[in-house]
């Protein structure tokens, strides 16, 4: 994802990420738990969102860090350092390139309802851009470590967790329903429909039930493979 205005990318400047980019990230993180209702819509989605699989489980962000939820990819920050890395024989200074930087929201998978997900991300990002405290929120949720490393357990314990099932995702969507319905962007019936569908899976303790049961997991994956 990137922020553009007047056909110009506003994610970075010559120093690094802009304040508006950090605010945008803070907004997404603020609604990340309920955004899974649109981005992770089947029970097997939550079998992926577990520690130590380069998949996010906690609400945080960072640079080139595969343990975080919102990731800033390497390459276009701080005067395009990646170009020098890829071309070590390059002698001349690389000109600053402002138009390439993106950020990744790493929770969604192939089950995502892409239209509702993108609408939700835009609303969340807008909230972050407009909120007065969003830079502080971004600062508090930034990590530059592997949060799943045992030596960083103290930091891990300060972070909010993503839901672990469709059922719990629906709970977060219900909690944030007023936010999504504001200004009529998401009709009430749309939110209620997502909640009803997600809770109907009745998968609240599915991960615990399937732990180390490879055949049952395979059967479930096969069942939901073509769900969309």
For each feature predicted by the language model, list its residue ranges.
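Active-site capping/gating regions of soluble enzymes
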Residues: 1-135, 139
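Acidic, glycine-enriched catalytic cores built around paired aspartates
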Residues: 139-228
């Amino acid at each position: 994802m990137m922020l553009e205005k007047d056909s110009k990318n506003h994610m970075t400047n010559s120093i690094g990420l802009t304040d508006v980019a950090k605010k945008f990230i803070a907004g997404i993180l603020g609604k990340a738990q309920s955004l899974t209702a649109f981005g992770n819509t089947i029970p097997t989605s939550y079998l992926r969102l577990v520690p130590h699989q380069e998949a996010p489980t906690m609400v945080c962000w960072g640079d080139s860090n595969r343990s975080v939820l919102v990731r800033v990819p390497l390459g276009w920050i701080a005067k395009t350092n990646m170009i020098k890395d890829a071309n070590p024989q390059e002698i001349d200074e690389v000109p600053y390139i402002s138009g390439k930087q993106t950020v990744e929201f790493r929770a969604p998978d192939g089950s995502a309802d892409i239209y509702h997900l993108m609408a939700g991300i835009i609303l969340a990002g807008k909230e972050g851009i407009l909120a007065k405290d969003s830079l502080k929120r971004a600062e508090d949720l930034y990590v530059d470590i592997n949060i799943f490393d045992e030596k960083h357990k103290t930091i891990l314990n300060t972070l909010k967790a993503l839901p672990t099932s469709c059922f719990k995702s629906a709970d977060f969507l219900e909690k944030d329903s007023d936010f999504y319905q504001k200004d009529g962007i998401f009709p009430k019936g749309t939110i209620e429909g997502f909640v009803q569908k997600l809770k109907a899976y009745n998968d609240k303790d599915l991960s615990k039930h399937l732990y180390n049961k490879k055949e049952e997991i395979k059967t479930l994956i096969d069942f939901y493979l073509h769900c969309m």
